[in-house]
């Protein structure tokens, strides 16, 4: 049976599947095992990637499902983002911490002191290059629209996990050397303790949920219908596809049928039957 890591790397378009050779074979399961060792408390989940002045559909939906999974496991998740996602997560009954565009280290340390996270997870959140730029996949600097959420991952003493799909996201600094020769743009330099790579970052988030469910026995992974409704709600609030820049029911150019394929495969990998709902 195909493992979680192989499922979330299906349909690879940007070389992530080739990078799996640089990763532990069980990188998703290993990340889930570590998360389950964290003391129960606040987990900060960073997300929100600026595309044409809007948040993209990749990232926030996956972050919402990881947050729900963590709640099921006894954690207290907090979404950490910027004004790009204002209002989205409150509608999901999730706690949110907003970071200002011009926040400096003192303010960021204050956020960490207030939250006191036992762990931090980034899901499709842009991180700085070694030159200090925030670059999208077209090589355009989006720093004017991107709060320094990545700096929290450098300032914290808590364990960290990054989920990305292109090379410019928080956590991809772990593979900066390998990415440098493969990307047109300069890769993110911000490292995390653990990294999950996927064709789509939402799929990486689903992979984490699947691994958490398999290890804990608790319902963590959404059904295809649940995931589609989550994306629909966020599109209604202004999220756009990262490829087409359109406010549409797609993620990085993949339609909902492909989303369902990935989720059904993950459900099969952990022994869950179709029709069984999540939390």
Locate the predicted segments by residue.
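Short internal beta-strands
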Residues: 74-82
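A glycine-rich helix N-cap at a beta->alpha junction
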Residues: 93-118
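Positively charged, low-complexity intrinsically disordered leader regions
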Residues: 1-42
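Short, glycine-rich nucleotide/cofactor-binding loops
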Residues: 19-23, 49-61
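C-terminal functional extensions of proteins
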Residues: 170-279
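Conserved mixed alpha/beta catalytic, RNA-binding, or beta-rich assembly cores of soluble enzyme
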Residues: 59-60, 119-120, 125-218
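Histidine-anchored nucleotide/phosphate-binding helix
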Residues: 56-75
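Structural motif
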Residues: 42, 118-119
């Amino acid at each position: 049976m195909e493992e979680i890591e192989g499922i979330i790397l299906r349909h690879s378009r940007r070389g992530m599947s080739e990078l799996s050779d640089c990763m532990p074979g069980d990188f998703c399961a290993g990340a889930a095992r570590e998360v389950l060792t964290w003391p129960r408390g606040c987990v900060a989940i960073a997300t929100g990637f600026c595309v044409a002045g809007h948040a993209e559909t990749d990232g926030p939906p996956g972050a919402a499902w990881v947050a729900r999974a963590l709640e099921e496991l006894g954690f207290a998740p907090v979404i950490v983002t910027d004004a790009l996602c204002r209002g989205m997560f409150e509608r999901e009954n999730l706690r949110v911490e907003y970071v200002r565009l011009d926040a400096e280290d003192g303010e960021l340390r204050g956020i960490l002191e207030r939250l006191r996270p036992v762990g931090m997870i980034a899901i499709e959140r842009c991180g700085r290059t070694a030159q200090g730029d925030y670059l999208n996949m077209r090589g355009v600097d989006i720093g004017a629209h991107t709060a320094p959420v990545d700096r929290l991952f450098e300032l914290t003493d808590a364990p960290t996990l990054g989920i990305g799909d292109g090379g410019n996201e928080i956590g991809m600094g772990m593979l900066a050397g390998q990415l440098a020769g493969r990307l047109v743009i300069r890769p993110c330099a911000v490292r995390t303790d653990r990294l999950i790579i996927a064709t789509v970052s939402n799929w990486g988030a689903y992979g984490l949920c699947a691994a958490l469910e398999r290890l804990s026995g608790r319902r963590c992974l959404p059904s295809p219908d649940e995931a589609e409704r989550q994306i629909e709600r966020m599109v209604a609030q202004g999220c756009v596809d990262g490829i087409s820049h359109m406010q549409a029911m797609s993620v990085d150019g993949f339609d909902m049928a492909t989303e369902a394929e990935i989720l059904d495969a993950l459900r099969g990998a952990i022994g869950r039957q179709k029709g069984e709902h999540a939390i």
